[in-house]
Amino acid sequence: MIKFNCSQLTRLKAVLIISACSVNFFSTATTMPAPVTNNAVAQVKVNNHWFLLSFSGLGKMKDYQDVHNHTYVYDVSKSQWRERSSVPIKHPINGLIGRLASVATALDDVAYVFGGYTVAQDHSEVSVPDVYAYHVLEDKFQALAPMPVPVDDSIALPYNNRYIYLVSGWHNDGNINLVQLYDSKTNQWQQASPFPGKAVFGHAGGIVGNILLICDGVRVDVHLNKGRSYAAESACYRGEINPLMPSKISWYKVKHPTGKSRYRMAAKGLIDSTSKSKEIVFIGGSHNPYNYNGMGYNGEPSIPSSEIWRYNLATNKWQITHSKTATMDHRGLLELNGELVTLGGMADKQQVLKRINHY
């Protein structure tokens, strides 16, 4: 068992308040029920117990038949994984129920799962409009108002314990620059101020208070007299939500930490429990954008990155470090008592992981 003592850690707490104390969190022998990547992840706290959640994704064979809708739940207090009810789909697409590139987040003790896309044998992909609330103790999915514009490979950011922002992403045939705002109190959608950069998919971002930061992803380039192509987009945009009108976001561009894009990073907004500094952290990903099997659009195998970027919201400055763990193909970053983790993902040589990754 790995034991963490608060006095020995640089303690971070997420926007969701997490207590700082000596506690055993993870067993090194604990593995997920199955290898999974491109899975939506979230964490919820119910009755003072933390749960880590994985929704849908891709199995170890990495083909269309390995796209699934499984739900895996990790009970932190018991150091135990369980497979639970599968993520529903209102209207199966050509009989397909599994999906990739869904996104998830949490408000209070409820997780929210958005979209994703199905993959057919002929490689056709369809964005799913479904939205579900997941209640972990009851193991129950509750259907909610569908997305006005179905997206996958997007970002879901929670705000004020009520709203969730879906920023950009892919819709069926191309990227969109929309910021779709879901109100959990009214179960209604509205459009927020659009994303100011090039529309992307596979980007990453986090939020602290009313400040959010979005970085990188993949854009679509259109060419003269030939087909369009995918290209890495290295750009970061900071947004400030108007607390009196949450649909209004003031956007501006910030300096990129390296000038080199990373695709499908894990990211999260954090507050340092000692210094109270606020930052957005980006971990892993790959410099080479790729198809869902981990092979680059350029035909070369994509390699995971060990880079960690930390953006300080007060100073507007970046800190770049490296992790001992290089992973990619993530949809979110989780945090417990100072430790940053991802669930599954891909390692070198496109290996689909069956573990909790520690950074």
Model-flagged regions — what are they?
Residues 5-7, 22, 237:
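Secreted/luminal cysteine- and crosslink-motif detector
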Residues 25-359:
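Kelch-like beta-propeller repeat domains
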